[in-house]
Curated annotation (Swiss-Prot):
The modification N6-(pyridoxal phosphate)lysine is found at K211. This is Histidinol-phosphate aminotransferase. Pathway: Amino-acid biosynthesis; L-histidine biosynthesis; L-histidine from 5-phospho-alpha-D-ribose 1-diphosphate: step 7/9. Gene3D superfamilies: Aspartate Aminotransferase, domain 1, Type I PLP-dependent aspartate aminotransferase-like (Major domain). CDD domains: AAT_like (cd00609). Belongs to the class-II pyridoxal-phosphate-dependent aminotransferase family. Histidinol-phosphate aminotransferase subfamily. Its cofactor is pyridoxal 5'-phosphate. It catalyses: L-histidinol phosphate + 2-oxoglutarate = 3-(imidazol-4-yl)-2-oxopropyl phosphate + L-glutamate.
Length: 353
């Protein structure tokens, strides 16, 4: 018997999530993971590495609650938003009995987290405009405990219609948890659902410091929900999810100065996004550039697989979306620096396809 034979059957059948770093590449223009393009400097101030950290660091919780305009008891901090996603599935879905539902094309970790735990995944593809198919969702809800909605959606970049989400919340009341994945909400803060928590006890919002806060390497995320949901999650989260250095830097990022700096970064990214979109729309091999509310754009490219490989060979690493439902011919491009955008523009302009 091999070691793999000892593993759970569902784990043996798993295909790991193909993260940007797992896919690799040897480029010098990294535009495939929706990271901020330059590093932000922080200095460690905590000098208590000999002690275990707080289970839920008070300074981080209170700072994030203030930033998100919620109560501290409505905030859980975790190792990235991905841990928050997994905690919700573990806490609310019974393997072999319950299901979760999501609407592709969207973020891939919902299914990976569910399959790892042994929870059934149901998919209801979005409509032609990438909005929710509410009748399709309603038809699949029996036995569903958690529904994931990503807004702005990754990789398409659009905001999900708020009225559709309200309809979904009414449809699932007393039946299922609805999770709004707001990893990119800093780029369109007017679209947040955090203010809806008082109206919908089954609404959960997941957030991160990885994008606009430029801290993807920190691995720090947040779950916003009513206290009853947070108390359930506290039963299954690891005792010390955030190390002392992570909590230290997160608290600095959430200070008044840190938030002001984040908003300056957002303004920079929005300017660069406008420039990139304008330039892409004038390139022969670019068939369509979709509107985006996030720090990336999705474009349909002639001979996209060949173009993707050509740019890869030039050290420009984009994200191929061809395998996602309804995204044939599409590449996702993270908004980088002006110099990085220009590399992409010049390379695409030179393509003869």
């Amino acid at each position: 018997m091999s070691i793999e034979d000892l593993a759970r059957a569902n784990v043996r059948a798993l295909t790991p999530y193909q993260s940007a770093r797992r896919l690799g590449g040897k480029g010098d223009v990294w535009l495939n993971a929706n990271e901020f393009p330059t590093a932000v400097a922080f200095q460690l101030t905590a000098q208590t590495m000999n002690r275990y950290p707080e289970p839920q660091p008070k300074a981080v919780i209170e700072s994030y609650a203030r930033y998100a305009d919620v109560k501290p008891e409505q905030v859980l901090v975790s190792r990235g938003a991905d841990e928050g996603i997994e905690l919700l599935i573990r806490a609310f879905c019974e393997p072999g009995k319950d299901a979760l539902l999501y609407c592709p094309p969207t973020y891939g970790m919902y299914s990976v987290s569910a399959e790892t735990i042994g929870v059934e995944c149901r998919t209801v593809p979005t409509l032609a405009d990438w909005q929710l198919d509410l009748p399709g969702i309603e038809a699949q809800l029996d036995g569903v405990k958690v529904v994931f909605v990503c807004s702005p959606n990754n990789p398409t970049g659009q905001i999900i219609d708020p009225q559709s989400i309200r309809d979904l919340l009414e449809m699932t009341r007393d039946k299922a948890i609805v999770v709004a994945d707001e990893a990119y909400i800093e780029f369109c803060p007017q679209a947040t659902l955090a203010g809806w928590l008082s109206d919908y006890p089954h609404l959960v919002v997941v957030r991160t410091l990885s994008k606009a806060f430029a801290l993807a390497g920190l691995r720090c995320g947040f779950t916003l929900a009513n206290a009853e949901v947070i108390n359930v999650l506290l039963k299954v989260i690891a005792p010390y999810p955030l190390s002392t250095p992570v909590a230290d830097i997160a608290a600095q990022a959430l200070s008044a100065e840190g938030i002001a700096a984040m908003r300056q970064r957002v303004a920079q990214i929005l300017d660069e996004r406008r420039y990139l979109v304008e330039q892409l729309r004038g390139i022969a091999c670019v068939e369509q550039v979709f509107d985006s509310e996030a720090n990336y754009v999705l474009a349909r490219i002639t001979a996209s697989s060949a173009v993707f490989k050509s740019l890869w060979d030039q050290g420009i690493i984009l994200r191929d979306q061809n395998k996602q439902p309804s995204l044939s011919g599409c590449l996702r491009i993270t908004i980088g620096t002006r110099a990085e955008s220009q590399r992409v523009i010049d390379a695409l302009t030179a393509e003869n396809v």
